[in-house]
């Protein structure tokens, strides 16, 4: 049975951890879905896979293109798509149009927006009223890289309280889940205990209701990984060796036999 947003909330109540990873193409999405991943995020981190230095340049059209491919490969997992930078911050109508296009054109079940400041809370509330499921995202928000950098957030009492307040406000606005990125584990635990919706951690300790990582980091494909990522295999090395072996056989006329 396909995973739903309501099922994620039930899993929090039952104490069942939620498994999430990113995907940007049909093949990886199919593999993740078949392996039992609960939530697949078509993240704007795809920008880095396309050669950009940050997530900012990725466009809505690029996200739509890749989200369609991901959805074609998924039968069970809940698919959530990031709204890219400046496709939802300008106005509520812009956000509704962008999010609506993602749901209508890709087959995804939800969108994710960054930030919990008052204007964003209002935007999310309107999206939810329009029938669009929304996942929130607080802590380190990569679309604010030029304001906040990529350092851990919430280390001071003031910033920790702000992030906690944002998470509570997002729940009240109607999000079905919140990503907690690169914040202290004790703050993530406090938020997880305070809200009734599942928290999905990335660099936020082990007390969240679920975990998400970038799949290229997990598989060892990335040139560099964030400090909180765990590399489970080194596909970059495996692929390099396979290509070198193929090239050697072609040059030596050993392939094809």
Curated annotation (Swiss-Prot):
Q: Which cofactor does it need?
A: Mg(2+)
Q: Which UniProt keywords apply?
A: Cytoplasm, Magnesium, Metal-binding, Pantothenate biosynthesis, Transferase
Q: Which residues bind Mg(2+)?
A: 44, 82, 114
Example GO biological process = pantothenate biosynthetic process
| Gene Ontology molecular functions | 3-methyl-2-oxobutanoate hydroxymethyltransferase activity; magnesium ion binding
Co-factor: note? Binds 1 Mg(2+) ion per subunit.
Q: Detail which positions bind 3-methyl-2-oxobutanoate.
A: 44-45, 82, 112
Q: Which residues form the active site?
A: 181 (proton acceptor)
**Where is the protein situated, by its record's location annotation?**
Cytoplasm
CDD domains on file: KPHMT-like (cd06557)
Report the enzyme's class at the first EC level.
transferase
- Tell me the InterPro entries matching this sequence: Pantoate_hydroxy_MeTrfase, Pyrv/PenolPyrv_kinase-like_dom, Pyrv_kinase-like_dom_sf
* Pathway(s) the chain acts in: Cofactor biosynthesis; (R)-pantothenate biosynthesis; (R)-pantoate from 3-methyl-2-oxobutanoate: step 1/2
- Tell me its EC number(s), please: 2.1.2.11
Pfam families for this protein: Pantoate_transf (PF02548)
Task: Output a single Gene Ontology CC term carried by this record.
Answer: cytoplasm
Q: Does the keyword Magnesium apply?
A: yes
What reaction does this enzyme carry out catalytically?
3-methyl-2-oxobutanoate + (6R)-5,10-methylene-5,6,7,8-tetrahydrofolate + H2O = 2-dehydropantoate + (6S)-5,6,7,8-tetrahydrofolate
Assembly and oligomerization: Homodecamer; pentamer of dimers.
What the protein does comes down to: Catalyzes the reversible reaction in which hydroxymethyl group from 5,10-methylenetetrahydrofolate is transferred onto alpha-ketoisovalerate to form ketopantoate.
The record's section on HAMAP family has: PanB
**Which protein family is it in?**
Belongs to the PanB family.
The name this protein goes by in its record: 3-methyl-2-oxobutanoate hydroxymethyltransferase
Q: Could you read off the lineage of the organism from its UniProt record? A: Bacteria, Bacillati, Cyanobacteriota, Cyanophyceae, Nostocales
Q: Which gene encodes it?
A: panB
